[in-house]
């Protein structure tokens, strides 16, 4: 990567407590690693606003009703990070990167069905009015679904829950280019 001869993406994940979850120390490390090896994107984000978790790279605005689950309270079926958010129909998260994105991007969400009825999916809306569907999960295991878009489209977007929404476990934004992502997971 350092010689710019590789097409690989390296994902680095820093695990820690709420200080890590605040993304202060990790952001300085991320900047150095991406400057040296290339920027492969924002990487892993918590499933919306979670107490003691923050991203130095994006602003998140949540609308509607959400119920947050934390693994320390009941450690059953959690994604990496130990948090999950259950939206009511129509609830949404607006995600605005703090720095402009460039190139082709992939937005991935981790979701799971947490009831017997078939889950609805998610809609990803862009400022120009374009809406893309993300696949609904088929089981109660965590599953990923993604869409691709140009950075121009992804400099602001809204993730909206449909009818009978699945639980949200993570949002991941990757630049489809060689380099490094550095994720901070404050597991409390």
Model-predicted regions and their roles:
Residues 1-8:
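A short acidic-Thr-Gly-centered motif at the start of a beta-strand
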Residues 8-11, 178-180:
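Loop/turn elements at helix/coil->beta-strand transitions in domains of secreted/extracellular proteins
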Residues 12-16, 184:
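Short hydrophobic beta-strand that contains or immediately precedes a catalytic carboxylate
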Residues 21-126, 130-188:
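Conserved SGNH/GDSL esterase-like catalytic core that processes O-acyl groups on lipids
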């Amino acid at each position: 990567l350092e010689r710019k001869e590789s097409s690989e993406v390296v994902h680095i994940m820093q695990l820690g407590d709420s200080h890590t979850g605040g993304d202060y120390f990790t952001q300085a490390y991320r900047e150095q690693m991406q400057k040296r090896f290339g920027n492969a994107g924002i990487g892993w984000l918590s499933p919306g606003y979670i107490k003691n978790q923050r991203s130095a790279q994006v602003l998140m605005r949540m609308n509607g009703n959400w119920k947050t689950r934390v693994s320390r309270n009941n450690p059953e079926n959690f994604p990496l990070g130990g948090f999950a958010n259950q939206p009511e129909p129509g609830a949404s998260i607006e995600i605005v990167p703090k720095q402009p994105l460039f190139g082709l991007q992939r937005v991935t969400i981790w979701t799971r069905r947490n009831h017997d009825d078939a889950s609805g999916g998610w809609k990803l809306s862009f400022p120009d009015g374009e809406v893309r569907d993300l696949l609904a999960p088929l089981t109660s295991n965590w599953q990923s679904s993604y869409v691709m878009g140009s950075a121009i489209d992804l400099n602001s977007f809204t993730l909206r829950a449909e009818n009978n929404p699945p639980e949200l476990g993570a949002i991941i934004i990757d630049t489809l280019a060689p380099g490094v992502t550095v994720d901070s997971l404050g597991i409390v």
